[in-house]
Every structure is written in structure tokens, then in C-alpha cells.
Amino acid sequence: MRILGIETSCDETGIAIYDDEKGILANQLYSQIKLHADYGGVVPELASRDHVRKTVPLIQAALREADLTPADLDGVAYTAGPGLVGALLVGATVGRSLAFAWGVPAVPVHHMEGHLLAPMLEENPPAFPFVALLVSGGHTQLISVTGIGEYRLLGESIDDAAGEAFDKTAKLLGLDYPGGPVLSRMAQQGVPGRFVFPRPMTDRPGLDLSFSGLKTFAANTIHANGDDAQTRADIARAFEDAVVDTLAIKCRRALDQTGFQRLVMAGGVSANRALRGRLAQMMQQRGGAVFYARPEFCTDNGAMIAYAGMVRLKSGVDADLSISVRPRWPLAELPPVAARS
């Protein structure tokens, strides 16, 4: 089975073709970072217009890369939510239209399920059950996963997502958009322990998280200590250490609560080297294992949508031709898949 995946939920246009026997046959990605850089964040209308310009040419490029024609495809998967409504509608409209024209099913995919299943694209995929840490610019959640579509929310951020906190703190440090990855590189030059940030909500029971206060703490620290290069690096290090420690503490609690021995990291922030190292060390000490996708599949991409769409298509899809998206869409509302395909 070969599935075309279309990802247009935010500011990346991702197109991929996945074969259930051969794996990824094509992967095309266009990032809008330069388009939004002058605004310091994603402008929804600009994002939608750029998806309109890029989606079909990238689909054509993916077919060429895979040396396939539309007749070789068995379905089209597209991100139906959550995300920016205009951006989602571009992918949904193109996906539904092509599927109708080609005579194949169209599969709406949950963006965060795509992220959650991205580690399945690797040579050593995780087995069920596991705890999933979904950590990105828009979401930070801990999920109990006992099968595909069998998701139970354990805890989530009550304010800023971890990735959002990274970007906002980076902006306070004068770093270019998107600042999260730049902050992480700067943190490598920082002196550990010079500044100590709080670990929010770790002094109370439960698995919910909070990161908005770290931004305020960073602003106050910058104001009180100046902004020379080394001080900025030290603040970046203290901020990253606080986020990583907080996530590790909450992951440990989630594993204790569920009794699971496998941890999956997914979403853009799962590419963070410090977080990967900390959680790998923690899981080794526990006698468990941590799983994550290669860095290019941690951020938004079409491959994860194609894979998730394939799984859903094999379980049966609705033949309804209506085009609808869900900017807000709880992961727990997804129906379960009877068996892993």
C-alpha cells in the first residue's frame, strides 16, 4: 500500500509517499521560516497563501522522487487538525480533491497522532504500551498509549507549551525567529549553575505542567544581570536545564503511575539534544527504553502523516467527500485501531 501524505497545519508544507513494505519513498519539505521571520512568529494568512503556492508543486516533486504516477497510489492522507484553520483547509482541499480525481480514499489525520507515530518510521520502533511525551510549539502532553487510537491524557501544560516557552525566552535574549533551536545552541556555551530557574509544578503531585513563569523569570534575570554574551548563554543554559528537568520529572512520574517501561518522545522539541540525553539516561537507569524519530521527522513533515494515514486507511475510512478541518481536536477523541498494521 502506498499513501501520499500532506502536512499543512502551520508553517511547513510537507509532502511524502509511504509504502508499507518499502518505507518512505519520497519526502519533500518547504519551510516558511524566512517568510515569517520579520514578524517574529507565524502570520496565519501568509502561511495559508504560501501553502497554496507550494503544495501541488511539492506533490509533483514527490511523485518524481519516488518515480511513481498517481495511478500507483492507494490513498491520500492529509492533516485535518489541530492547527491553523486556513492552513489546514489548504491541505484538506488539495488532499480531498486529488483523492476524488484519482479514485482513491482520502484519510483525515490528527496532527499529533502523526507526531506520536513518527518513531514508528525508524528501524527500531516502540512496542505498546508506552508513555508518550508530545512536546512541541503548540502542545506539551503526557499520554498513556496502549495501542493506535488508544490514548489517555495523563497531564498537559496549563499555559505555554514547552516549545512556545523556548521561542519566547529566545526572543527576550534577542535571538532570531524561530529562537528555540538557537537558544539550545547558545545554552551549550553557558556555565551550568550560575543561574537557577524554578522547576514549575514539580513540588506538587500530578502530571500537569506550566512553562509561562519561566519566561517571566528569564526576563527578570536578564534585567538584573545585563545582557553580555556570556550572561545570555548562562541564562539560556539555566532556562533549558529547568525545562529539561521539569519534563524528566513529569515523565518519571508518568512511568511510575502507568508501570510502563517504554517512553516515546515526539514533536519538535523532541529533537533537543539535552532533553534526549537526559531522558535516555533516566530510562537506562530504570531498565527501560526511550524512542524518538530522527530530527527531520520530529518537526512537522509529510512522512508522519502518510504513515498515520496508512494505519487509519487499513482500519477503514469514511467515504464522505466533505472537506472539514478541526483547529482544536483532542487526541483522546480518535477511535482505536483494532491491531497494529
From Swiss-Prot:
Subcellular location: Cytoplasm
Binding site for substrate: L134, V135, S136, G137, G138, D167, G180, N272
Cofactor(s) the protein requires to work: Fe(2+)
Protein name, per record: tRNA N6-adenosine threonylcarbamoyltransferase
Cofactor binding note: Binds 1 Fe(2+) ion per subunit.
SUPFAM superfamilies according to UniProt: Actin-like ATPase domain (SSF53067)
Keyword Transmembrane recorded: no
Top-level lineage group: Bacteria
Annotated keywords: Acyltransferase, Cytoplasm, Iron, Metal-binding, Transferase, tRNA processing
Gene Ontology molecular function: any one: iron ion binding
CDD domains xref list: ASKHA_NBD_TsaD_bac
EC number of this enzyme: 2.3.1.234
